[in-house]
């Protein structure tokens, strides 16, 4: 899978390095082409299912799942500790921050979003990659009760790579702006409502909470499909990197040999071995009582912690 990913990345970067900058920006891989690119039947089936699920991930579809009507007014449903409402002072701070967010949008979208009114705000715990960071979800209503929009504010901090690129100086004064601008640079089509704002002394980027985003569950595909999938990932990553105008430099670094592919395969193998060692140490610590866990967590997860 690693070799497939790196080889696809190398080939696509080499191709795009010879293309005009504008063509690189327009070059895209839509669902139909992605389906054609996949050689494994099982992966093509998962792509089809992921696309179908993504088309249903919209604000209006989320309305009955995440809200309820109380005294004639829509409210976000609490699911403690994952979704909780805010104190009035924090609600006011988020609402004020959304006013500032409007100024980061293109004029057309500023008018569109400005036509919506805030109905409810809640704090929402998000994925593993954002553990320890704050995130809000905001329900807004437009011209009718069925005309709804969910926005998500996610805290943004300075990249862990920044010290190695910019030293102690910050290339962007606002880290939410950094996330938005880099996402727009890497993606052919980004969320048009991407923007940034500040709540208190914390910086955030803002996006649609439900914007037809989809993913392929890796535990649903076999080894052959995983290898195929890794090649698609490498292909797409190359497109994103090429849009930043660095394709020629990257292609030159790869050269004509497979030395980099071999090096990354060795690294991946070593990393996999280390992961198994780390996991074994983690399991030992849990079983010995040195690390606390939530009661019942292991029984419901099909975990390797079970004896």
Predicted regions located by residue number:
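Conserved ATP-binding subdomain of kinase catalytic cores across diverse folds
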Residues: 1-59, 96-307
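Acidic/Ser/Thr-rich, low-complexity mid-to-C-terminal regulatory regions of eukaryotic proteins
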Residues: 46-83
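Ordered core of a single globular domain
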Residues: 68-117
């Amino acid at each position: 899978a690693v070799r497939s990913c790196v080889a696809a990345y190398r080939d696509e970067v080499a191709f795009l390095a010879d293309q005009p900058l504008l063509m690189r920006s327009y070059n895209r891989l839509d669902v139909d082409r992605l389906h054609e690119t996949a050689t494994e039947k099982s992966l093509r089936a998962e792509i089809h299912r992921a696309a179908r699920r993504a088309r249903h991930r919209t604000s209006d579809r989320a309305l009955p799942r995440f809200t309820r009507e109380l005294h004639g007014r829509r409210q976000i449903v609490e699911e403690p500790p994952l979704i909780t409402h805010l104190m009035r002072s924090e609600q006011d701070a988020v609402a004020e921050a959304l006013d500032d967010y409007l100024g980061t949008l293109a004029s057309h979208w500023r008018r569109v979003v400005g036509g919506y009114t805030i109905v409810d705000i809640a704090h929402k715990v998000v994925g593993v990659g954002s553990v320890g960071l704050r995130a809000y979800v905001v329900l807004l209503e437009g011209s009718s009760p069925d005309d709804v929009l969910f926005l998500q504010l996610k805290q943004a901090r300075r990249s862990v790579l920044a010290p190695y690129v910019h030293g102690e100086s910050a290339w962007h004064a606002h880290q939410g702006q950094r996330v938005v601008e880099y996402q727009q640079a890497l993606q052919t089509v980004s969320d048009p409502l991407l923007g940034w704002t500040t709540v208190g002394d914390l910086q955030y980027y803002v996006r649609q909470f439900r914007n037809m985003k989809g993913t392929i569950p890796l535990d649903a595909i076999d080894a052959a499909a995983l290898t195929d999938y890794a090649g698609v990932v490498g292909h797409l990553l190359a497109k994103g990197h090429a849009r930043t105008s660095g394709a020629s430099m990257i292609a030159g670094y790869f050269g004509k040999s497979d030395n980099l592919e071999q090096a990354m395969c060795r690294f991946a193998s070593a990393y996999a071995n280390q992961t198994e060692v780390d996991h074994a140490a983690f399991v030992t610590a849990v079983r010995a009582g040195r690390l606390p866990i939530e009661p019942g967590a292991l029984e419901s997860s099909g975990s390797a912690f079970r004896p």
